[in-house]
């Protein structure tokens, strides 16, 4: 009767043990990875939180979100805190001389989004005061935003965090209203920006509609209407809040009537986060 030599048995057993060990290590590594959604917050001064107040911002729901600080600490994640993006000034997105970031809508957005989806968010700051869409397309703003987004992905990978979904939130329009950007120009430029961000991995753009100018209600209307039309015509644009259009109480703005105070930012963020989360909950599997 033929028998397998003892040394071959040993080799066979060792090989089997190695295979089991590799499987076990792989399973362990899979279990230690977490999944989070990556969201980049883009726009101008009201996205930056120029009229906010950290002391009036909501507390973060435990486990709901983190901030990736591309400029000040690019090698790790921080628990989300206000003022969001406080010192994230660099290159084309450096607006240090224009405004101070005092408190944003981002924490309220993330809390509401997390309540809907149960998925934590890694938030990236990428806004600049007084920025028009043409500026985003021609002055290096979109490239700086892309660099920050891609750096966040690298950091998340290093931290063993799987990027489940990638989105952008857009809150902008005052600059284009001042420039008298036409309806067609605004829609075309916004579509170009979103298309560029999609090339960076963004799945959808969540849009917060611009609010009215309290001193001249007609001034912002063309851009406000263009934003609504763009969301109807472009499947990559998802309207998540029209609340700014309803917040016409002067007490909700700063003394210039331009920047929303923290009370308004909390309301806008919560509304947008809830609606964005509901969208992701329903359509999130449709990558």
How would you label these PLM feature ranges?
Residues 2-16:
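N-terminal Sec-pathway targeting helices
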Residues 2-3, 23, 256:
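A general, composition-driven signal for non-globular sequence regions
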Residues 18-35:
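Bacterial Sec-dependent signal peptides at the C-terminal "C-region" and cleavage site
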Residues 30-287:
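Cell-envelope and extracellular/periplasmic
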């Amino acid at each position: 009767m033929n028998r397998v030599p003892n040394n071959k048995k040993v080799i066979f057993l060792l090989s089997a043990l190695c295979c089991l060990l590799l499987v076990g290590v792989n399973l362990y590594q899979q279990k230690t990875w977490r999944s989070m959604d990556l969201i980049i917050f883009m726009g101008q001064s009201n996205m930056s939180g120029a009229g906010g107040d950290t002391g009036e911002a909501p507390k973060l729901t435990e486990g709901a979100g983190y901030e990736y600080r591309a400029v000040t600490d690019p090698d790790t994640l921080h628990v989300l805190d206000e003022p969001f993006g406080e010192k994230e000034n660099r290159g084309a997105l450096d607006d240090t001389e224009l405004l101070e970031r005092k408190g944003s809508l981002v924490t309220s957005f993330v809390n509401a989004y997390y309540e809907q989806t149960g998925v934590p968010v890694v938030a990236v700051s990428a806004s600049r005061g007084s920025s028009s869409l043409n500026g985003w397309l021609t002055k290096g703003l979109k490239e700086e935003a892309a660099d920050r987004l891609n750096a966040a992905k690298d950091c998340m990978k290093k931290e063993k965090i799987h990027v489940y979904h990638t989105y952008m939130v857009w809150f902008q329009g005052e600059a284009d209203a001042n420039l008298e950007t036409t309806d067609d120009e605004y829609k075309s430029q916004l579509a170009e920006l979103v298309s560029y961000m999609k090339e960076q991995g963004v799945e959808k753009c969540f849009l917060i509609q611009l609010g009215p100018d309290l001193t001249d209600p007609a001034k912002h209307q063309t851009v406000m209407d263009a934003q609504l039309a763009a969301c109807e015509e472009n499947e990559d644009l998802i309207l998540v809040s029209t609340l700014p259009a309803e917040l016409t109480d002067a007490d909700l703005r700063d003394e210039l009537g331009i920047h929303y105070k923290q009370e308004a930012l909390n309301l806008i963020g919560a509304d947008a986060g809830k609606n964005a989360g509901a969208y992701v909950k329903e359509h999130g599997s449709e990558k």
